């Protein structure tokens, strides 16, 4: 009996791995196309293609790949607007038109309303432990909103989702959520100087002390990496492996940031300059 169980588990692991490889092969053209704009967004499309095949036993249509790519680029533009960063108005209008043509007008409108509400309550940087918690919750809410939107988009091809509801109850999407959060941590660590200068909320700008922010971010990364409450089924093996890789990368980036902050302490840090400017004002 144990041999049969082991053989069945091996088949499921092999099957899930082949599905992941197939999704990567189908999405390869996206790496050299104009859309989506970054390799990380291509990997996101790959993940949803693989998840769809796991659930529905068939890959996503190529047309849906293009819609997901447009949605990811549209999200990047809207986030840049809320952050006060440069963005392409032409790109924003073009991606919005693609989404409207795909029948996603109502979903996009709902997302923009929810996103406006979240951004209207975004926490300010450089606070206490409570501020870090609020910033983390804000970051998580934005990620869950966009993941829910992507899931709702895939729902038009057989995925049972409900509108733009965030994927709280879906164990498989929870793994993807944690992968994205690890990537968010990596991005926040790498963009610390720019975020601090601009006064943007992030994992590293949330706390008044950079050292405390690094430690709290490290703890958050460990929590996202924890697999105790994640599904252990063999069909999600590729996702669990991806989470492990993202977690290792996040930990390494945090360790490097900790080392740099310890060896390069000076009064010219973006955090210090921002405080000095506020005091002189």
Question: What are the residue ranges of the model-derived segments?
Answer:
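Active-site/pore-lining binding-face segments in mid-to-C-terminal subdomains
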Residues: 169-231
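Conserved N-terminal diphosphate/IPP-binding helix and adjacent helical/loop segment
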Residues: 1-73, 77-81, 108-117, 121-132, ...
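Generic alpha-helical secondary structure signal
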Residues: 12, 58-62, 93, 166-170, ...
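All-alpha helical catalytic cores of prenyl diphosphate-utilizing isoprenoid enzymes
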Residues: 34-49, 64-67, 84-196, 248-252
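Structured alpha-helical bundle/scaffold domains in large eukaryotic membrane-trafficking regulators
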Residues: 86-89, 194-197, 201, 236, ...
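Hydrophobic, Leu/Ile/Phe/Ala-enriched alpha-helical segments that form helix-helix packing faces
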Residues: 18, 95-103, 220-231
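Short, charged, amphipathic alpha-helical segments
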Residues: 88-89, 93, 204, 235-243
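Catalytic cores of phosphodiester-bond-cleaving enzymes
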Residues: 217-281
